[in-house]
Each structure stands twice: as structure tokens, then as C-alpha cells.
Regions:
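Amphipathic alpha-helical effector-binding/dimerization core
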Residues: 63-158
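A structural signal for short hydrophobic beta-strand segments in well-ordered beta-sheet cores
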Residues: 53-55, 102-103, 204
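Short, highly charged C-terminal tails/helix-capping segments
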Residues: 248-257
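Extended hydrophobic
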Residues: 166-241
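Short amphipathic alpha-helical signal-transduction/dimerization elements
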Residues: 18, 140, 144, 148, ...
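Amphipathic alpha-helical regulatory segments at dimerization interfaces
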Residues: 32, 84-95, 184, 241, ...
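N-terminal helix-turn-helix
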Residues: 1-76, 82-83
Length: 257
């Protein structure tokens, strides 16, 4: 079956805007997609009319629109397992007062499905839909433990690129870290994806296979030994709760695959 070029191009525009931290000009969009403005204009106008993107005349830039938010919420509402996990995450935040994430693996990257915000004024700002290479995050390390070094090298043919000076960039060092994750039952991100941010995560398994991961992130200045102890205790407890539900029920897990 052939891909419809115009539809595919519209989706590429949305993916590009989602990948950016800031809105983009039409020139930037066209340069990224290697497309002329004449062919992009009808696509942009259609996305604007349907509210999939918005336009800011003051900065002459485009950003994601409310239609995507609505569709995303409706999508999540259809999956009881995500609603259940979200309730567990809210409980985690009430205990630890830090930001909680639930994610799956999408090729070489972490796919953030859910986020429960910290109650603190200073908190994490990563959004749903953000992607990070799995090797640089605690969430990702939890899901890479099932991979061999050959498989991981295939995931990252250009090597392990640093996001911060503390990112692991050596495959052998990463494999040692993943072995430690298997042994300890949790993974660490010690300022490897963001400077001044600490993260701890646990794998979520069903029938012995890792299908997702759950994490708590906190600014480094709040990450005391007592805070880490509370975070790990809470994550491991809630991991058991979620896994029991997954293993005891016939829930549809297609959203996690």
C-alpha cells in the first residue's frame, strides 16, 4: 500500500513541531523537511484550519494546537490500564512530592506516556511526547536490560552520544550498568539526561518480560539520601501493585507495545 504524500508530510510537520522546545517558523519547517514553501503552504493552512497547529503573528511561528491535545486525551481515556497507572502515579506524587513518569520503549528512544507533576514549585518540565535516547535515562535503562550488547549496538549505530558530561558513552560501561540494574531492581540517571536532575526508575514486567518503566525525577538539590530511600521504597512498592494488576487481569496492553 502506497503512502499518501500530502498526509505523510502533514504528519511530519506535527512530529517536527512536537520534537522542538520552541515554536518554528515556516522557513525552519521547510528546511527541516527539505520541502518548498509552495508545496507546504496548503498543508500548513489545513493544519491551522483544523487547529492541529497554531500561528503566532508576533513571532511569525507555528506550534502544536489544541486539536492534538483533545485527540491525545481521548486516546488515553480509551485505555483502562493507563488510567489505572495514572492513579498509582498520583499516589506516588502524594508520597514523594516529586514528578513521576511512565514510559515504554520506542526503538532506541523512551516514549513518555504519562506524567504526574510534582507539588513543588521547582519541578521537572519534560512533557508527554518528549523523546530521549534510552541509554541516557533511568526509564530507558530499565527497558534495555533485556537486550544484548549486539542488539544495543544495532539500536545506536552512531554510538552513544552524550546529552550531558555525565552521559554514558561506552557500550561496555552501559552493559555493566544494565547488569547492575538487573541485580538491584532499579536504574539510576545521575544527571545523564539533564544536569542537576536525579532520576530513579523501576522496570514494569508482565509474565517476566519488561513492557514499561516507572520513574521519579527530582532536582539534584532536593535529592538527599533520605529522599532517595523514600523514592526507591515507593517505586518498588508501586511496581508490585501495577505488575499484580497486569498479571491478574486480561487488560489490553496494545497501547504499551
Amino acid at each position: 500500500m502506497n503512502i499518501h504524500n500530502a498526509v505523510n508530510r502533514a504528519l511530519e510537520v506535527l512530529e517536527y513541531l512536537a520534537s522542538r522546545k520552541q515554536p518554528a517558523t515556516l522557513t525552519e519547517i521547510c528546511q527541516h523537511l527539505d520541502a518548498p514553501k509552495t508545496s507546504m503552504n496548503p498543508i500548513i493552512y489545513t493544519l491551522l484550519a483544523r487547529k492541529f497547529i497554531i500561528y503566532d503573528p508576533a513571532s511569525d511561528t507555528y506550534a502544536l494546537g489544541s486539536a492534538l491535545y483533545k485527540i491525545g486525551n481521548e486516546y488515553l481515556e480509551k485505555f483502562d490500564i493507563l488510567k489505572y497507572v495514572r492513579r498509582v502515579m498520583d499516589d506516588i506524587v502524594s508520597i514523594c512530592s516529586e514528578t513521576c513518569y511512565f514510559a515504554t520503549l520506542d526503538g532506541p528512544n523512551v516514549n513518555y506516556l504519562l506524567k504526574a507533576d510534582s507539588t513543588e514549585k521547582i519541578r521537572m518540565v519534560s512533557s508527554i511526547g518528549t523523546t530521549f535516547p534510552a541509554y541516557a535515562t533511568a526509564l530507558g535503562k530499565c527497558m534495555l536490560i533485556q537486550y544484548s550488547i549486539d542488539e544495543i549496538e544495532q539500536l545506536y549505530p552512531e554510538g552513544l552520544k552524550p546529552l550531558t558530561p555525565k552521559t554514558i558513552t561506552n557500550f561496555n560501561v552501559l552493559m555493566k550498568e544494565l547488569s547492575d540494574v538487573k541485580h538491584k531492581g532499579f536504574a539510576c540517571d545521575d544527571e545523564e539526561s539533564y544536569l542537576d536532575v536525579q532520576c530513579r526508575a523501576v522496570p514494569i514486567c508482565r509474565n517476566g518480560a519488561v513492557i514499561a518503566s516507572l520513574s521519579i525525577s527530582t532536582p539534584a538539590f532536593r535529592f538527599t539520601s533520605r529522599k532517595e530511600e523514600l523514592i526507591l521504597k515507593t517505586l518498588l512498592q508501586k511496581k508490585s501493585v501495577i505488575e499484580q494488576t497486569l498479571n491478574d487481569s486480561q487488560v489490553d496492553l496494545s497501547v504499551l507495545l
